Amino acid sequence: MENEKSTGNKYTVKDAAIIGIFCAVMFVVFMVYSTLTGASLFYSMIFNAAGAALILAPFYVYMCMKVGKHGPALVYNIMWAIIAGLMMGPFMIPWFLGGGIIAELSMCGKNAYHDIKRVSISWVITALVRAAHGMSEIWFFRDAFLATGVSEQQVQVQTQYYTDPKYVLLSLAVTAIPVSYTHLTLPTNISRCRSRWSPYH
């Protein structure tokens, strides 16, 4: 019995494949979404992360509950840490990695990855980390950010929005909405999906 329980907590090739596929899909969806909405600078600065969190929430919840084991929240954020390091600069890696660790810590405890509320909490942490990454470039990593060769105009725009409390609070507040979305729209399907995800099905 104990051996069976232990085996059930181990990652399988299928688990790794699910995480890999869903991370790739979420990355592609995010890039398409950002490309389509990138024309509006104000939207990109304030609402991009909120819209992405809303769109990607079902993918994230399905991935976490399908695997049902500790790790998906951290792995997803590690993916973004690597992407951010390549696209924005190595200085952003600790930001996303730290967010991933916090998100994964929020999932401590038995069966957390089968609890829609716990999964939702980890998702909003992840979304807030993304929403605040542009702020962190101005608040904490300004010198490293400038060293990447970013235009003065970009720095001025980010400084304008991310040093104004009302815009900072607006961006973070609207990003938290996906938690409510996840609670209200996904739980109705969880019991049906669980039977399909069961290893004994």
For the regions a protein language model found, what residue spans apply to each?
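Alpha-helical transmembrane segments of integral membrane proteins
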Residues: 14-22, 48, 52, 71-76, ...
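Alpha-helical transmembrane segments of multipass membrane proteins
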Residues: 22, 26-30, 56, 60, ...
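Conserved small/polar residues in nucleotide/adenosyl-binding loops
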Residues: 182-188, 201
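Interfacial aromatic-anchored transmembrane helix boundaries in multi-pass membrane proteins
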Residues: 34-39, 79-107
